[in-house]
């Protein structure tokens, strides 16, 4: 397993971060997984431990810089397919990667975060289409996120379905998924930091059952 350290100048500060700034985990694997960059929910919740009550939060300036760094890390990955969750924080994270590769992006609500906090209340497809006109949201249900707290078993089932689907494809090694902490944990058994990239073999067995956290 290798972790890359990336330094980037943001404003007047230098960030030299290993575990949470576009670092990479290698498991000798296939497709690329990327957790979204730091959102305003992450910023406030990590400081206070209290849900700040922000629905569908945007990325912070640091999160935007993390997304740009992730794009740089993935620049030589020869991506042919990009999948992304419909949450704003994921759509903002994917933007510099989409621009780099000039690829259409498939927006999939099946890879969304496990609903447990206010940040997991999403935006309707019409609102998303206004914010991100470069993407197609017409296929999404009006309320594509889970109402209230999603049962852990439902999150695991979504992850298992996605793993099964990707294991049958021949392009998994050039596919990127931009998703969220709990979904990626259910998929891989690994807790990823904001903007951390992981290579993952979708033919791997399902990880041990997640412990409830909310």
Which ranges hold each PLM region?
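A generic secondary-structure signal
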Residues: 69-73, 161-168
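Glycine-rich phosphate-binding loop signature in dinucleotide/nucleotide-binding domains
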Residues: 76-78, 166-173
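Phosphate-handling substructures
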Residues: 43-44, 48, 53-58, 100-160, ...
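Short, well-ordered beta-to-alpha junction loops that form the rim of enzyme active sites
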Residues: 84-88, 110-111, 178-182
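Short active-site segment of divalent metal-dependent hydrolases/proteases
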Residues: 39, 183-184
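Active-site-proximal alpha-helix that buttresses catalytic centers in soluble enzyme cores
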Residues: 26-30, 34-107, 129-131, 156, ...
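Acidic, low-complexity terminal tails and accessory targeting/binding regions
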Residues: 11-30, 114-134, 170-173, 185-214
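Basic polycationic patches enriched in arginine
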Residues: 2-3
């Amino acid at each position: 397993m290798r972790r890359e350290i990336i330094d980037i100048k943001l404003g007047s500060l230098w960030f030299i971060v290993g575990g949470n700034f576009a670092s990479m985990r290698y498991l000798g694997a296939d497709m690329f997984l990327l957790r979204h960059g730091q959102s305003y929910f992450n910023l406030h919740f990590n400081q206070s431990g209290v849900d700040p009550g922000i629905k569908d939060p945007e990325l912070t300036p640091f999160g935007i810089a993390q997304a740009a760094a992730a794009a740089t890390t993935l620049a030589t990955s020869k991506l042919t397919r990009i999948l992304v969750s419909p949450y704003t924080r994921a759509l903002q994270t994917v933007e510099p990667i989409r621009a780099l590769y000039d690829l259409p992006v498939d927006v999939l609500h099946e890879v969304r975060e496990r609903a447990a906090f206010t940040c997991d209340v999403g935006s309707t497809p019409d609102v998303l289409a206004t914010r991100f006109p470069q993407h197609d949201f017409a296929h999404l249900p009006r309320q594509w996120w889970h109402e209230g707290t999603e049962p852990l078993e439902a999150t695991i089932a979504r992850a298992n379905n996605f793993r099964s689907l990707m294991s049958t494809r021949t392009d998994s090694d050039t596919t990127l998924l931009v998703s969220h902490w709990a979904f990626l944990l259910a998929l891989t058994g690994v807790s990823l930091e904001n903007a951390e990239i992981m290579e993952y073999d979708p033919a791997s067995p399902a990880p041990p059952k997640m412990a409830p956290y909310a």
